[in-house]
Amino acid sequence: MRLSPVLLRLSRGPALLALALPLAVALAFSDETLDKVPKSEGYCSRILRVQGTRREGYTEFSLRVEGDPDFYKPGTSYRVTLSAAPPSYFRGFTLIALKENREGDKEEDHAGTFQIIDEEETQFMSNCPVAVTESTPRRRTRIQVFWIAPPAGTGCVILKASIVQKRIIYFQDEGSLTKKLCEQDSTFDGVTDKPILDCCACGTAKYRLTFYGNWSEKTHPKDYPRRANHWSAIIGGSHSKNYVLWEYGGYASEGVKQVAELGSPVKMEEEIRQQSDEVLTVIKAKAQWPAWQPLNVRAAPSAEFSVDRTRHLMSFLTMMGPSPDWNVGLSAEDLCTKECGWVQKVVQDLIPWDAGTDSGVTYESPNKPTIPQEKIRPLTSLDHPQSPFYDPEGGSITQVARVVIERIARKGEQCNIVPDNVDDIVADLAPEEKDEDDTPETCIYSNWSPWSACSSSTCDKGKRMRQRMLKAQLDLSVPCPDTQDFQPCMGPGCSDEDGSTCTMSEWITWSPCSISCGTGTRSRERYVKQFPEDGSVCTLPTEETEKCTVNEECSPSSCLTTEWGEWDECSATCGMGMKKRHRMVKMSPADGSMCKAETSQAEKCMMPECHTIPCLLSLWSEWSDCSVTCGKGMRTRQRMLKSLAELGDCNEELEQVEKCMLPECPIDCELTEWSQWSECNKSCGKGHMIRTRMIQMEPQFGGTPCPETVQRKKCRIRKCLRNPSIQNLRWREARESRRSEQLREESDGDQFPGCRMRPWTAWSECTKLCGGGIQERYMTVKKRFKSSQFTSCKDKKEIRACNVHPC
């Protein structure tokens, strides 16, 4: 019996031959007579031949290149997916890329190279390294690899896949298992015009657009704008072919210009709404500040929209900020299929394009209007040496974003009779039974349990269920969704495949032989990755043991040891760890030498995969008000720790502080207290007294200006005599002075009861030569009487104005 080529890789050594044979039996390849297969006569030609019955007319398997391009760009990486629509599956596969009209029997027939994404799922064929096959033959519904397009001049390439489903049933190459891509030859790099066909689909379809920004300092390090990087609000619509929002080779409208230069969607939305007959839904989603952060992946901005037969195209755009006029988006993406149905899913990687309205070449170039306006075009790596995307070798620009458009509902009578997949079969299930994850960030759940068995026991549509536990509800005002989830399924009667199949991990490397001389044993282990879907017990072995021989003819220097003891427990509870075991020397070497046999061993051990939950943080709050109302201060913002990491501490920053600067604080004028009133400037008749105060601080930065510093008030001593002689006047003044002094001395006891005062000192010098100064004099206590209870007995001070004339 010859093994299927899918299984031949298992027979690469005598140790694996024993595994390959029972596995072939398990897959039932030996249940029917196999046709003889001729030996390979050329390079990799054997991988295109499989024994058994070939099936045709299948639609459940598909080979898809991400974005569904018809052309490839030389040297560009493309994600290739081979999938089976539920409830179908496949066990084995081969995938190759051939130049058009080549058979694959020569090395030069193959085009491009594949890159492995998941080594547990896929590997290169050992005897045909240009082809990809499965790592382990088991039930699967999807695999993915990268394909690197060949150099320029290769021409058209055909990707071909072969599917082994079960027993000896296989599908190969034709129809949906073949994808033809031709070398890009377009005016615009990376842009190919697709003719827009009339749509024949019925009813309407509802889609969700999700935008994943990938523009970051890590992916695009050259001149990355750290402070103000962002994506503007998404704006677009679902529309007919009679309306164009934007397109390569066209001119930007005023709305597109304002999005491209200012990040403002207002004018663009106004333009879209003016085309009400041609537009079904306006698409809007929030802006992203900053352009990249983990939240952009966990809770990427999204928007829902609808399409119908006449308005089956969708377009949108968003600005890269800061930039001169650079955007990303889709133009006239057709969601109607040739089979009169609605596209299930679209995934597109996006590169930036220039709106043709500003001639800047760097992220933060000053405004430089393009006059006359140029056509919209994709940016290339050869545009300008100062461009952040410049590459002297002309390589492709790394994608800056990805958009995913998924169909989430269909309404009305549908005219595509043949369903796309099981989801289409049960498209009319109630909304609560849809498999949509709308879990708020404030709800922390455990991992989902495995899916239950399908509710239908025959080949008919049914439902299956899974459950999870609500661990924490961080915000009681936000309700948490149900802890049960339902998914459409087809009963087991649709396939004669055993539903009790369980998924196993790869075998861990064989342990060392149990003895150092002679015949012993060695073992290896694996673990169950997924238990059977029908809930039965997995009966596949998790440990294998085989004999091993080391130095059949043991020399006199050999020593005799006990069997190895049991392995210690694995040092890890999940993931990769270490375990040890020991043995003892039973008999030393006959020649008296030291026993060189190992007495302890350590090896890696694999526990079930770790499922860790990183610490969950809230969004940053808005910056607080500045700590001051003017001048220099500080402001802060915070975020909350919603959930600790399942393993380890959360070391993320919870508070940020930065300086803030407000206009300088106004400084008001500052003055001293008023001085005491001066003596009247006349000895008789009407006069005036003054008092003054000093400026201590001049006003600054709009502070209150200084008020008056000198005040006057009238005073009147007594009436002056009319026309007295000067001599008589002086005599009278002298007499009055003597009389006043006598009265003062006589009244000292009454004016200052309880103490005797010294006379007033002389007036001090004026503090200013002009403009109003002050003078001071003092009277001090000479003697206090012991029996005095008066509080007026204290030192005195008088102040008067002087030199009040202007300077």
Swiss-Prot record:
Boundaries of every Reelin domain copy: 29-194
Record-level GO cellular component terms: extracellular matrix; extracellular region
Sorted UniProt keywords: Cell adhesion, Disulfide bond, Extracellular matrix, Glycoprotein, Metal-binding, Repeat, Secreted, Signal
Glycosylation sites: 214, 681
CDD domains in the cross-refs: Reeler
Single Gene Ontology BP annotation: positive regulation of amyloid precursor protein catabolic process
Organism: Bos taurus (Bovine)
Domain TSP type-1: start-end pairs: 442-495, 501-555, 558-611, 614-666, 668-721, 754-806
Broad class of the protein's primary localization: secreted
Source species taxonomy: Eukaryota, Metazoa, Chordata, Craniata, Vertebrata
InterPro entries assigned to the protein according to its UniProt record, in alphabetical order: Reeler_dom (IPR002861), Reeler_sf (IPR042307), Spondin/Thrombospondin_T1 (IPR051418), Spondin_N (IPR009465), Spondin_N_sf (IPR038678), TSP1_rpt (IPR000884), TSP1_rpt_sf (IPR036383), TSP1_spondin_dom (IPR044004)
Quaternary structure and partners: Binds to the central extracellular domain of APP and inhibits beta-secretase cleavage of APP.
Subcellular location: Secreted, Extracellular space, Extracellular matrix
PROSITE patterns on file: REELIN, SPONDIN, TSP1
SMART domains assigned: TSP1
GO molecular function, a single term: LBD domain binding
Protein name: Spondin-1
Keyword Iron: no
Disulphide bridges, residue numbers: 44-128, 156-182, 199-336, 200-340, 202-415, 443-480, 454-489, 459-494, 502-538, 513-517, 548-554, 559-595, 570-574, 605-610, 615-650, 626-630, 660-665
